[in-house]
């Protein structure tokens, strides 16, 4: 069993390296706690180019709208055209309370955002430690959200899919 797991990890690493060299995948290091407990500082993830409209729960990598070259990793909670309301610690999309099994802590402060057809509303899973999400920087333009996180490859004990 141990050798088959090692072989699988070597195969995965080879595939990641090959695809990354061909520009189909991107490696990314998680540097902050805003996505904990899903993603922790020191985790390494794989992202693929985002080709279709994001779904609620997808984790995206996008450039900070006010700091060129600085990228953020956040989860989609509001979809294009929706109204997102944060009230009494809960997130609502078009008047429905969202089930957010990934969220760590209540969502504050209260507010209302009407999303344009080409924008999404993103939040960090660790709501108390996520300063660079849509509560503070506004909705994210889909043009800027170029990468979708699809898996974690480090640490070895946490290898696998991430997201929903």
Each model region followed by its residue ranges:
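Extended hydrophobic leader/signal-anchor segments used for secretion and membrane insertion
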Residues: 1-164
């Amino acid at each position: 069993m141990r050798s088959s797991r090692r072989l699988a990890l070597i195969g995965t690493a080879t595939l990641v390296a090959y695809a990354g060299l061909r520009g189909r995948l991107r490696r990314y290091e998680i540097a902050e706690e805003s996505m904990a407990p899903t993603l922790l500082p020191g985790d390494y993830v794989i992202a693929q180019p985002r080709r279709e409209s994001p779904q609620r729960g997808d984790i995206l990598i996008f450039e900070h709208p006010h700091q060129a070259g600085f990228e953020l990793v956040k989860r989609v909670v509001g979809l294009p055209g929706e109204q997102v309301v944060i009230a009494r610690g809960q997130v609502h999309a078009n008047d429905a309370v969202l089930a957010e099994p990934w969220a760590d802590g209540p969502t504050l402060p209260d507010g209302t955002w009407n999303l344009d057809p080409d924008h999404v509303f993103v939040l960090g899973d660790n709501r108390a430690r996520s300063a660079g999400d849509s509560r503070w920087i506004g909705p994210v333009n889909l043009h800027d959200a170029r990468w979708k996180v699809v898996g974690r490859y480090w640490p070895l004990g946490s290898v696998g899919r991430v997201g929903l």
